[in-house]
Amino acid sequence: MSVKSPFNVMSRNNLEAPPCKMTEPFNFEKNENKLPPHESLRSPGTLPNHPNFRLKSSENGNKKNNFLLCEQTKQYLASQEDNSVSSNPNGINGEVVGSKGDRKKLPAGNSVSPPSAESNSPPKEVNIKPGNNVRPAKSKKLNKLVENSLSISNPGLFTSLGPPLRSTTCHRCGLFGSLRCSQCKQTYYCSTACQRRDWSAHSIVCRPVQPNFHKLENKSSIETKDVEVNNKSDCPLGVTKEIAIWAERIMFSDLRSLQLKKTMEIKGTVTEFKHPGDFYVQLYSSEVLEYMNQLSASLKETYANVHEKDYIPVKGEVCIAKYTVDQTWNRAIIQNVDVQQKKAHVLYIDYGNEEIIPLNRIYHLNRNIDLFPPCAIKCFVANVIPAEGNWSSDCIKATKPLLMEQYCSIKIVDILEEEVVTFAVEVELPNSGKLLDHVLIEMGYGLKPSGQDSKKENADQSDPEDVGKMTTENNIVVDKSDLIPKVLTLNVGDEFCGVVAHIQTPEDFFCQQLQSGRKLAELQASLSKYCDQLPPRSDFYPAIGDICCAQFSEDDQWYRASVLAYASEESVLVGYVDYGNFEILSLMRLCPIIPKLLELPMQAIKCVLAGVKPSLGIWTPEAICLMKKLVQNKIITVKVVDKLENSSLVELIDKSETPHVSVSKVLLDAGFAVGEQSMVTDKPSDVKETSVPLGVEGKVNPLEWTWVELGVDQTVDVVVCVIYSPGEFYCHVLKEDALKKLNDLNKSLAEHCQQKLPNGFKAEIGQPCCAFFAGDGSWYRALVKEILPNGHVKVHFVDYGNIEEVTADELRMISSTFLNLPFQGIRCQLADIQSRNKHWSEEAITRFQMCVAGIKLQARVVEVTENGIGVELTDLSTCYPRIISDVLIDEHLVLKSASPHKDLPNDRLVNKHELQVHVQGLQATSSAEQWKTIELPVDKTIQANVLEIISPNLFYALPKGMPENQEKLCMLTAELLEYCNAPKSRPPYRPRIGDACCAKYTSDDFWYRAVVLGTSDTDVEVLYADYGNIETLPLCRVQPITSSHLALPFQIIRCSLEGLMELNGSSSQLIIMLLKNFMLNQNVMLSVKGITKNVHTVSVEKCSENGTVDVADKLVTFGLAKNITPQRQSALNTEKMYRMNCCCTELQKQVEKHEHILLFLLNNSTNQNKFIEMKKLLKS
């Protein structure tokens, strides 16, 4: 039942840190009291709008054990005076007439039911017969009993009888109802429909049960109340035993609640996945981790030597079940019981998987074990429904690998109180960061639900009149659509006097219009009056995005605010919609708002300063301080020059100064900003808006597009789509679902262009458009290349690379929505080759096409030029890797050119999602801080794990075994934590490849020493130098390291393969690929041959099924390197001499003879191309 964590936990870290932290903490129900001896009170969970109800306990049933006898009954009993035996020796409530010394006790819950009230005639006999040892009572004594104990005025009647049974009629319609409200457990209903209709009235009086277990422990419950009997034989067999068993049973509702709420963000691992509508997530937190360890140990100890016997559980009971796979005991809830087959269907509540097992592998849960909440929660993906009505098998196959046993972040959207509490969640995929519902919709497996976001189709829905409504403090029900604030509308060219209310940066600040100052002041007075009249409340939990009233912490005044996020269970991040600033507040400082207070539009206008960009890439504190000084407490003229997606591009001018002061110009003059390449100017008002196709914005904005980008030394899988020559061809990158997105885009584009829309498109060179391709009759994205004199247009199909001539009618205007996907056709050229003549020969083009057409290739980027990307193509589908350029060179179809790109340029083009690859291994140590690793003795052979391979001359390994200085490492971790968390101001830190740094590990948020393996604009890849873990972090999670923290040597070692020289510089990527396939993340044996500048020269051996394999010999065998070690060369010569003197000399001569014959046949064959590779092998 153990679940493998998807990430590498630092196994050698002595600090007992949980493997991960939850984004938002959650609390468990406190376990202050033990269960009562019987019929435990169900503790309420979260408080939904419509509490569900639970079946009434079967012990109570419909028994009527509290009643009064009418006069006819008294007379009837009196008339039986002469009959020798009373028909009920136990009496009305289990009391037997007899001597006091013979009295015993029997639980009243099993007393005999009285005669039916509907019967007109009294019964002649009662089912239960008296025991032999019970003496018949005399008539006088019985008459006295009746007069005394059945008298209405006799107080003993009320003390002897059990408490009245609560009516089980439906609170709304009056019919029989055995279901009760799970919150107050007092009101009964016949169906869910009646409960919903009654909720508006019942919610006023409904209060959660407040169990007092201390009192219950000292006071017998109704079902176990003792009454007196004469002898054990008076009690029906099995009654006492049955009560004892029920007293021991623990139901699912007895477990404590997780206290999860809507909008909370938690993290965990998906341990069971059936389909997107049914999967389980095992939560990760320090509490869960600690409990799982304690539970495992407790169950192992408690149930180690139990004897197998058939325990008969009941549905809904929490038991201990032995899992079939690993034979361990785990908590499970009983889903169903088949007594005849002696089997039960169980669900393991801490993992989510289920199975059918024999009853002899099930035991009741020991009451001494803590009633911790289930560690796995049942979930379904919110905001999406299956496209085909049910989740298809293809969908399950595609999505299960994305989630199963993956550590991911989920956000609770809704909570459904079903038989098992189910959570509607948004799941962020761990690898891509995308939301699962978006992925399902993009892949065509799901659809956006209409009318609801997160409810299942079969889930109970609220009444239509309740949808979209909420109750304010004064119990006035308002529609949520009335609580949406109005937004100020600004147009390009608008100019107004205002004040800057809040500044984050020059690209993120808020302005207020001065003309609305009086209305805003009146609003503040109304807010204060309204909020001061409201009593404090602790049950207000606004949803993210809701508008409410918030009490500002600095002046304790009330303002309108929007809930941005939940910082914890009791605090939220709010943004003040009239000012722009934000802060974290306690929920006690919030209250609901009314529509009247939302009549004034939100006054904070989000702005971006026009014409400037930060000179250093980010805005420095000095630049922000200067801007605040320029506009603080001043009336500023604000001019809107453009409208962005959710903000306005504005110019700020201080006209109170002479001459007028432009904030943008001051920032430029101070050197804090640089001017934008294309300054935004006022747009003409006479823009033509006619003949605009449907779906295209009437306002013509400049279209923006991007190409797929690759960085130098980046290696990707590609397929060639268009070929002009080895110096110009186009490729598709086979990455993730890019081609599927392209196909979907082409379908949408074709549907859009076939709608016979009015076409006002006028071709301009370099402009994107939709173009018709006559080859297959479809529409594709294109760029206008040339406008011909005959009116035709040459277009470049940007996703494929071909250039075609089309007519003006075969062009359409393109919408910006079709430009979101980067252009997929990448222009490439083979690196390090050139044509034999001025132009590429037909033979070279044909041969190149034969080598690459329809084949998945590996491309390594060698250079990036204006004419395309220079790549090295490798065919991995053959028996050995084949470099395409080498094939053309060997066949004398092209010439090899001297590559000017051996050394990597400093200004590499790097995609922001791709990391630079470290190639200059030995020279890449940090210039700022030199660091050292532990040094191993020469000639020592150790076992190690290879962590990362940069080249044959540099790879990192971690020796096996615990380090000797473990205590120092723990002290160092504490020092790093104090150093990195200390408040201080530092300039932006951008580490370089090979630098030593401090890195904050994702799983425990502790700081550790690390080595930089690669960098991008936003991320950095690091290797934790003392533990061997590798992960990619945002730049904010790395800090520079001090020399004092480098005094202790790193526990990893730097290695270089002994005595190898590459035969061909272009094959280095093949060597790295083979090395990674052979020994990356593998346990190998390292023999230290020497140490130079803290780099261990080693020979590497790996054990395989065929014996020990030397890695260097493997490379030499593949012809990718040659051995330059004198000792090894001498050994090879000795081996060759031995073979020359052995008895196989004659056989070797015969082999050489056959080789000559084979070469002769190949040289004289009609088709040279088919045998070139074979000739090459024979000549080598």
From Swiss-Prot:
<dbReference type="InterPro" id="IPR050621">
    <property type="entry name" value="Tudor_domain_containing"/>
</dbReference>
<dbReference type="Pfam" id="PF01753">
    <property type="entry name" value="zf-MYND"/>
</dbReference>
<dbReference type="GO" id="GO:0051321">
    <property type="term" value="P:meiotic cell cycle"/>
</dbReference>
<protein>
    <recommendedName>
        <fullName>Tudor domain-containing protein 1</fullName>
    </recommendedName>
</protein>
<dbReference type="Pfam" id="PF00567">
    <property type="entry name" value="TUDOR"/>
</dbReference>
<feature type="region of interest" description="Disordered">
    <location>
        <begin position="1"/>
        <end position="66"/>
    </location>
</feature>
<dbReference type="GO" id="GO:0005737">
    <property type="term" value="C:cytoplasm"/>
</dbReference>
<dbReference type="GO" id="GO:0008270">
    <property type="term" value="F:zinc ion binding"/>
</dbReference>
<feature type="binding site">
    <location>
        <position position="170"/>
    </location>
    <ligand>
        <name>Zn(2+) 1</name>
    </ligand>
</feature>
<keyword id="KW-0217">Developmental protein</keyword>
<keyword id="KW-0221">Differentiation</keyword>
<comment type="subunit">
    <text>Found in a mRNP complex, at least composed of TDRD1, TDRD6, TDRD7 and DDX4. Interacts with MAEL. Interacts with PIWIL1, PIWIL2 and PIWIL4 (when methylated on arginine residues). Interacts with TDRD12.</text>
</comment>
<feature type="zinc finger region" description="MYND-type">
    <location>
        <begin position="170"/>
        <end position="206"/>
    </location>
</feature>
<feature type="binding site">
    <location>
        <position position="184"/>
    </location>
    <ligand>
        <name>Zn(2+) 2</name>
    </ligand>
</feature>
<keyword id="KW-0469">Meiosis</keyword>
<feature type="binding site">
    <location>
        <position position="181"/>
    </location>
    <ligand>
        <name>Zn(2+) 2</name>
    </ligand>
</feature>
<dbReference type="GO" id="GO:0071546">
    <property type="term" value="C:pi-body"/>
</dbReference>
<feature type="compositionally biased region" description="Basic and acidic residues">
    <location>
        <begin position="27"/>
        <end position="41"/>
    </location>
</feature>
<feature type="domain" description="Tudor 2">
    <location>
        <begin position="541"/>
        <end position="600"/>
    </location>
</feature>
<feature type="binding site">
    <location>
        <position position="206"/>
    </location>
    <ligand>
        <name>Zn(2+) 2</name>
    </ligand>
</feature>
<comment type="similarity">
    <text>Belongs to the TDRD1 family.</text>
</comment>
<feature type="region of interest" description="Disordered">
    <location>
        <begin position="450"/>
        <end position="469"/>
    </location>
</feature>
<feature type="region of interest" description="Disordered">
    <location>
        <begin position="79"/>
        <end position="138"/>
    </location>
</feature>
<feature type="compositionally biased region" description="Polar residues">
    <location>
        <begin position="79"/>
        <end position="91"/>
    </location>
</feature>
<keyword id="KW-0862">Zinc</keyword>
<dbReference type="GO" id="GO:0007283">
    <property type="term" value="P:spermatogenesis"/>
</dbReference>
<feature type="domain" description="Tudor 3">
    <location>
        <begin position="762"/>
        <end position="821"/>
    </location>
</feature>
<dbReference type="InterPro" id="IPR035437">
    <property type="entry name" value="SNase_OB-fold_sf"/>
</dbReference>
<dbReference type="GO" id="GO:0007281">
    <property type="term" value="P:germ cell development"/>
</dbReference>
<dbReference type="GO" id="GO:0033391">
    <property type="term" value="C:chromatoid body"/>
</dbReference>
<feature type="binding site">
    <location>
        <position position="202"/>
    </location>
    <ligand>
        <name>Zn(2+) 2</name>
    </ligand>
</feature>
<keyword id="KW-0677">Repeat</keyword>
<feature type="binding site">
    <location>
        <position position="190"/>
    </location>
    <ligand>
        <name>Zn(2+) 1</name>
    </ligand>
</feature>
<comment type="function">
    <text>Plays a central role during spermatogenesis by participating in the repression transposable elements and preventing their mobilization, which is essential for the germline integrity. Acts via the piRNA metabolic process, which mediates the repression of transposable elements during meiosis by forming complexes composed of piRNAs and Piwi proteins and governs the methylation and subsequent repression of transposons. Required for the localization of Piwi proteins to the meiotic nuage.</text>
</comment>
<dbReference type="InterPro" id="IPR047376">
    <property type="entry name" value="Tudor_TDRD1_rpt1"/>
</dbReference>
<feature type="compositionally biased region" description="Polar residues">
    <location>
        <begin position="110"/>
        <end position="122"/>
    </location>
</feature>
<keyword id="KW-0744">Spermatogenesis</keyword>
<dbReference type="InterPro" id="IPR047377">
    <property type="entry name" value="Tudor_TDRD1_rpt2"/>
</dbReference>
<dbReference type="GO" id="GO:0043186">
    <property type="term" value="C:P granule"/>
</dbReference>
<dbReference type="GO" id="GO:0034587">
    <property type="term" value="P:piRNA processing"/>
</dbReference>
<dbReference type="InterPro" id="IPR002999">
    <property type="entry name" value="Tudor"/>
</dbReference>
<keyword id="KW-0863">Zinc-finger</keyword>
